[in-house]
């Protein structure tokens, strides 16, 4: 199995979910530093959706087979080895840098 690292896209089901949370077997991108994924089975992921909504924290995927937008305001911590997942692909360095820069804004004091 391919090692999950920062920038990896996987498909995984996080059901059961509630309310407006993303449901079903769907793509997620790993945002945790690769040191975290190397020594732990737990990492922070953002869901990927084909939403049409424009929002500063919904970042379109470019340069990938996976389509949609990364929903940076819906981060989840996943124990990915406790669930059935499938590695899909890695994003480009440029896209990963863009995602990480936007995620930092979510945690700034405001």
Question: Could you say what each language-model-derived stretch is?
Answer:
Residues 1-110:
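Conserved functional hotspots at enzyme active or ligand-binding sites that engage polyanionic ligands
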């Amino acid at each position: 199995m391919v090692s999950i690292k920062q920038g990896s896209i996987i498909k995984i089901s996080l059901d059961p979910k509630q309310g407006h949370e993303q449901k079903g077997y769907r793509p997620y991108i790993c945002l945790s530093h690769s040191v975290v994924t190397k020594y732990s089975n737990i990492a922070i992921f953002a869901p990927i959706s084909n939403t049409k909504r424009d929002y500063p924290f919904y970042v379109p995927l470019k340069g990938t087979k996976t389509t949609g937008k990364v929903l940076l305001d819906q981060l989840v911590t996943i124990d990915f080895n406790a669930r059935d997942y499938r590695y899909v692909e890695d994003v480009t360095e440029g896209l990963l840098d863009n995602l990480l820069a936007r995620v930092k804004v979510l945690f700034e004091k405001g």
